[in-house]
């Protein structure tokens, strides 16, 4: 049997993580990253889910920004929090900055006991729009305006994949512009608002009772002569 659920119903009924979208005004790189890392670590630091450490994906606008601005800033922020820089993974699709070991670790983000699982701060450039499924991804941060508006929606969706049988919440960090873009894309693609992907109250959650009907029986009747 096949059941089709919309995005809203999938979140509200536990087939995806709940989402907590946070919008930031007057975004500047360092201030935004400090707030993002502090909130992420407060919510998810020290936790594991099915042996996997929670991950944060930080999307930069370009390769050079990712490597020369975001990564050094992130290293400083982690140092101030006592978090080792070895937890950073830079995957930007450029061999100058991303080596074979980095690609291996990226592919092992969801594999317990690997170096990839130890990486919790993933710096990306447009990676993960489609086809990237990382169950241990619990947050995304996107403060630059991407070339494609649909990318804001695609990046947000990456962190909603369910893990464990618990109700868990992913966090989405956005500039105010990207927050409004996400709301608009949800309207266009799912006929819903940004509030619909936030944590619903117990009163808003719907319980469905599924009853399987037996297959119909066919009886052949013979007409009397």
What is each of the regions a protein language model found here?
Residues 1-118, 145-153, 158-225:
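Helicase-associated low-complexity regulatory tails and linkers flanking the ATPase motor
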Residues 23, 126, 135, 141-144:
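Residues that line or immediately flank small-molecule/substrate-binding pockets and catalytic motifs
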Residues 88-92, 131, 137-140:
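N-terminal, helix-rich and Lys/Arg-enriched segments in bacterial and organellar proteins
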Residues 122-137, 155-159:
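SF2 helicase motor core recognition
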């Amino acid at each position: 049997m096949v059941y089709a659920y919309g995005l809203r119903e999938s979140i509200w009924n536990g087939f995806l993580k709940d989402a907590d979208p946070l919008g930031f005004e007057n975004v500047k790189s360092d201030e935004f990253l400090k707030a993002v890392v502090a909130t992420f670590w407060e919510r998810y630091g020290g936790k594991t889910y099915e042996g996997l450490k929670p991950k944060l994906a930080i999307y930069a606008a370009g390769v050079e920004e990712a490597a020369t601005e975001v990564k050094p800033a992130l290293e400083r922020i982690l140092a101030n929090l006592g978090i080792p820089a070895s937890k950073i993974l830079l995957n930007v699709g450029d061999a100058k900055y991303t080596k074979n070991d980095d690609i291996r670790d990226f592919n092992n983000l969801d594999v317990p006991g690997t170096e990839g699982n130890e990486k919790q701060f993933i710096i990306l450039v447009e990676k993960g729009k489609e086809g990237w499924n990382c169950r241990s991804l619990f947050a995304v941060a996107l403060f630059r305006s991407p070339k494609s508006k649909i990318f804001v929606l695609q990046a947000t969706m990456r962190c909603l994949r369910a893990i464990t049988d618990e109700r868990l919440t992913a966090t989405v960090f956005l500039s105010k512009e990207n927050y409004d873009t996400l709301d608009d894309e949800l309207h266009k693609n799912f006929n819903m608002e940004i509030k619909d992907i936030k944590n619903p109250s117990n009163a808003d959650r719907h319980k469905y009772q599924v009853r399987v009907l037996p297959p119909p029986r066919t009886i052949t009747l013979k007409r009397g002569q």
